[in-house]
Amino acid sequence: NSIMFFMIIFGICALSFNWADFKKIYTVKEVNIYGTTFFDQSIIEEKSNAIMSYNIFNSKLRNYKDEILNFDHIIDCKISRKFPSTIDITIYEREPVALISSDELIILDSEGVCLPVEYCDLSLPILTNFKSNPELYPKGSTTASTNVLNSVILMKYTKDNFSMIYEDISEFVFNEDSEYEIILKNGKTRIILGREKLQNKIKYLSLFQETLKEEKNIKDFKYIDLRYNDQIIVKEA
């Protein structure tokens, strides 16, 4: 009797799914994309069009996730079903923090991973006068340049803790004296950091900005020299 009971239940379920398929209840009609903050969402939308009209139970959704993960700028993605006919896609992106020019322009994320620029149109600081050998910047992998990686870490630190300064940076320069400089977006302010304790120098720059209050701004200076202990040397524009 118990076998007969389970056979009846199985038959009812099978008939239900066949009926639902016949009525197209479980056909994907909507795809929602979340989490695209830094990069162009249209490349995900193009791929999502391919799963419209799929049955929501279709095992090919796993293949679709693998296709998304082929993009270097995506760390992970989660695809979830919202019955009866909606797919939600959550994207986890890499965070772009700087640009560098090798044989082509390259985005560097917060971990120093090299990414293509075609999916991102953000205004980012450019790392200038660093080694440009293409082998130092393998796409989808961490830069092989320790100097560049340390500079990326500094840019990330500045972005997280002193966002107003970060947003004003046009170039981060490794100069001919092997010292680090910042060129602001106004094109006229040069900030000399020196060679060491660079995070502290960014802190000092922020404190200097605070002491100016509303009277002036760091952009009002031609250069700001932070290389020396207990003093800041400035020249007005």
Q: Could you describe each region identified by the protein language model?
A:
Residues 1-32, 42-55, 62-66, 70, ...:
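Charged, solvent-exposed interaction patches on well-folded alpha/beta domains
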Residues 35-38:
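Short polar catalytic/cofactor-binding loops
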